[in-house]
Every structure is written in C-alpha cells, then in structure tokens.
Amino acid sequence: MILIIYAHPYPHHSHANKRMLEQARTLEGVEIRSLYQLYPDFNIDIAAEQEALSRADLIVWQHPMQWYSIPPLLKLWIDKVFSHGWAYGHGGTALHGKHLLWAVTTGGGESHFEIGAHPGFDVLSQPLQATAIYCGLNWLPPFAMHCTFICDDETLEGQARHYKQRLLEWQEAHHG
C-alpha cells in the first residue's frame, strides 16, 4: 500500500499538489492522509498515524517547499510519530524495510536549486534522507515539480501524470 502524507498548509490554494493527488487517487492501493485537514489544531493522533504507517509499503511525504524546508505540521508529525522505541532506538523497527519518497513542489525553477547562490536540491533533502535512513527506511530519489507558480495547466497536468507514473512503477516493481 502507498501512504501519502500530504502536508499543504493552504490546500485550497494548491494547483500542483492538487493535481498530483488527483492522479494518485486513480491508482489502487493508495491512501492519502491530509495533515492540515486532519490536524488543524496540530494535535496529532500518534496511534492513528503509526497504524496507517504500519500498513504502508511506500510512504510519500508530499508538500510544497517552504523556505527550503518542509511545512511546520509535517515537521511536528515526524517528531511525534517517528517516536523512540517505535521508529528508532531499542525495539524501534516498525519502519524497517519500507520505502520513502519525497514528493515536493517548488515555486522556483530547477536551476534555482543548483549549488551556488542557493543550496543544491540534494543538500535540501539531506535531513529528510538522514531521518529515513536512521529509521530503517529505503530512501528513493525525490520527485520534484518546479516552477509551479508560473506553469500553465497543461504543464502541471503532465507533471502530475509523471508523478502517478513514478508511483505506478514502484507498485509494479514491488507488487508485480
């Protein structure tokens, strides 16, 4: 099962992430948990989230990039749900062997994330990748949709279909 942990602080204003979710919903075996809809008060139901994660083979963290980072509720979700003794530490093997895909949208172009004036995209992913590896997850190459503020509808739809294809290819490779 693919579990998408969706963290968009303003989902009604989304153009790119909305299309990505629409494409993902067309696949069998996909569950979407929209954190800002489930937890507008930031009071996370840790047991419910851990139960959802236990059913997943692929976990997707999908969100818009905010100031070169993840939205605050996703950070809190990771801090609370990936708890000691469950996700890491003595007895913390609940996530071992599962896969993690970071699916992120950005307003800037791909060149904006090249080493130079701004941090490279690989540098930005390091804290997430380190968290995944520390918890025994298999880190997959990220999916990034760039220039989402200026893309036309056709481009956004094409990128959303590409996202669906990434998920489908993972399903086929792991579940035949």
UniProtKB/Swiss-Prot annotation:
GO CC annotations, alphabetized: plasma membrane; potassium:proton antiporter complex
GO biological process: intracellular pH elevation; positive regulation of potassium ion transmembrane transport; potassium ion transport; regulation of intracellular pH
Residues forming coiled coils: none
Catalysed reactions, semicolon-separated: a quinone + NADH + H(+) = a quinol + NAD(+); a quinone + NADPH + H(+) = a quinol + NADP(+)
A Pfam family matched in the record: Flavodoxin_2
Chief place where the protein resides: membrane
Disulfide bonds: none
EC number(s) recorded for this UniProt protein: 1.6.5.2
Residue ranges crossing the lipid bilayer per the database entry: none
Gene3D superfamilies: 3.40.50.360
InterPro entries reported in the protein's UniProt record: Flavodoxin_fold, Flavoprotein-like_sf, K_H_efflux_KefF, KefG/KefF
SUPFAM superfamilies hit by this protein: Flavoproteins (SSF52218)
An annotated Gene Ontology molecular function: NADH:ubiquinone reductase (non-electrogenic) activity
Binding locations of FMN: 8, 14-17, 65-68, 105-108
Entry keywords, A to Z: Cell inner membrane, Cell membrane, Flavoprotein, FMN, Membrane, NAD, Oxidoreductase
Localization, UniProt: Cell inner membrane
Cofactor(s) of this protein: FMN
Membrane topology type: Peripheral membrane protein
Group of enzyme by EC: oxidoreductase
Assembly description: Homodimer. Interacts with KefC, forming a heterotetramer with 2:2 stoichiometry.
Protein family membership: Belongs to the NAD(P)H dehydrogenase (quinone) family. KefF subfamily.
Record-linked PANTHER family: GLUTATHIONE-REGULATED POTASSIUM-EFFLUX SYSTEM ANCILLARY PROTEIN KEFF, GLUTATHIONE-REGULATED POTASSIUM-EFFLUX SYSTEM ANCILLARY PROTEIN KEFG
Protein name stated in the entry: Glutathione-regulated potassium-efflux system ancillary protein KefF
Organism in which the protein naturally occurs: Escherichia coli (strain K12)
